[in-house]
């Protein structure tokens, strides 16, 4: 359920803080959110796929940790990101 290279490059370009930025929390969270959304769609069609469900839970946990880090480091960047991604409805 990996995202395509074009989609990944588009997300990196949109959320990067500067040229060549692939490791900032914003980029990592955006990529994880895309993966999580794809896995959710996959699991709706394949309810018995328990292995993918475990992978989904790991990705959600990783994103949660990155969001907590960003919230503690810079609350304004955190708020902008969750609004942009549509998290925390």
Swiss-Prot record:
The gene is rpsO. NCBIfam families: S15_bact. InterPro entries: Ribosomal_uS15, Ribosomal_uS15_bac-type, uS15_NS1_RNA-bd_sf. SUPFAM superfamilies: S15/NS1 RNA-binding domain. SMART domains: Ribosomal_S15. Signal peptide: none annotated. Part of the 30S ribosomal subunit. Forms a bridge to the 50S subunit in the 70S ribosome, contacting the 23S rRNA. Keywords: Ribonucleoprotein, Ribosomal protein, RNA-binding, rRNA-binding. GO terms for biological process: translation. GO terms for molecular function: rRNA binding; structural constituent of ribosome. GO terms for cellular component: cytosolic small ribosomal subunit. Belongs to the universal ribosomal protein uS15 family. It comes from the Bacteria. It comes from Lactobacillus gasseri (strain ATCC 33323 / DSM 20243 / BCRC 14619 / CIP 102991 / JCM 1131 / KCTC 3163 / NCIMB 11718 / NCTC 13722 / AM63). This is Small ribosomal subunit protein uS15. One of the primary rRNA binding proteins, it binds directly to 16S rRNA where it helps nucleate assembly of the platform of the 30S subunit by binding and bridging several RNA helices of the 16S rRNA. Forms an intersubunit bridge (bridge B4) with the 23S rRNA of the 50S subunit in the ribosome. Pfam families: Ribosomal_S15.
């Amino acid at each position: 359920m990996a995202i395509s290279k074009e989609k990944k490059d588009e997300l990196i370009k949109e959320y990067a803080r500067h040229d060549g930025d692939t490791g900032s929390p914003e980029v990592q969270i955006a990529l994880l959110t895309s993966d999580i959304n794809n896995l959710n769609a996959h699991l709706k069609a394949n309810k018995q796929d328990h292995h993918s469900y475990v992978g989904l839970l790991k990705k959600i946990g990783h994103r949660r940790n990155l969001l907590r880090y960003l919230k503690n480091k810079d609350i304004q960047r955190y708020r902008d990101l969750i609004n942009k991604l549509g998290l925390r409805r």
